[in-house]
Design a protein with these regions (language model features):
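Hydrophobic transmembrane-helix microenvironments that flank and shape a buried ionizable site
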Residues: 8, 20, 147-149, 153, ...
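Hydrophobic alpha-helical transmembrane segments
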Residues: 9-13, 17, 62, 97-102, ...
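Juxtamembrane helix-loop-helix connectors linking adjacent transmembrane helices
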Residues: 39, 45-55, 81-153, 158-168
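Residue-level recognition of pore/gate-forming positions within transmembrane alpha-helices
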Residues: 65-69, 104, 180-183
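Small-polar-interrupted transmembrane alpha-helices in polytopic inner-membrane proteins
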Residues: 161, 172-188
Length: 188
């Protein structure tokens, strides 16, 4: 393996590690602050941290996702890991936007059908947590805008961009596949 590829893969690993560490730290800080604000003592907080119920209410989850997304976005943009420019928007890509909306809407029915066929059930704790979060009006902006924006900056802006520099144009599909696998792995 040449030095350029090794350096690029290390950089991708750093991006991934930073993104995960931000999530872990923000989860702990937001969870502990929330439990302290609710009047829990230290031993109850430790119990909640170990049993996974630290981020169980909708407001706390919403705050966690918002802070996590904002911190990750700011860090990756400010460090230059995910360069942002207006050149694409200045090209007025209205046809692309139109087709994205049409294709997104067009996938709803097939995905609903596939969901019914597979009968995949979400874990009860996850279902309760997201149901509680979606009762918060701001959660739609957090889950629909902030979180996807942060993930795009990390996985496409930093990770995929770096991987694409390591592959010949003919093999860009390898970089895209690696980025997709990393994205899926982070999402469990």
């Amino acid at each position: 393996m040449n030095k350029k590829i090794a350096k690029g893969l290390v950089q991708v690993g750093i991006y991934l590690l930073v993104f995960i560490v931000i999530q872990i730290v923000v989860m702990q800080v937001v969870g502990i602050c929330s439990l302290l604000a609710q009047g829990f003592n230290a031993s109850e907080i430790v119990t909640r941290m170990t049993d996974g119920s630290m981020l169980s209410d909708g407001k706390t989850l919403c705050i966690f996702f918002a802070i996590n997304a904002v911190l990750a976005s700011l860090l990756f943009v400010r460090r230059g890991w995910a360069p942002v420019s207006r050149s694409y928007l200045q090209s007025r890509p209205w046809a692309v936007l139109f087709w994205v909306v049409i294709l997104s809407l067009g996938t709803l029915i097939p995905f609903a059908f596939i969901e019914e066929l597979t009968d995949v059930q979400m874990p009860e704790a996850t279902l309760r947590a997201f149901s509680a979060m979606l009762r918060e009006p701001v959660s739609y902006a957090v889950l629909g805008v902030l979180v996807p924006l942060a993930e795009e900056l990390v996985f496409r802006g930093a990770i995929l961009r770096t991987l694409l520099t390591l592959t010949h144009r003919r093999y860009h599909w390898v970089a895209i596949a690696i980025s997709a696998v990393l994205f899926a792995a982070v999402h469990g």
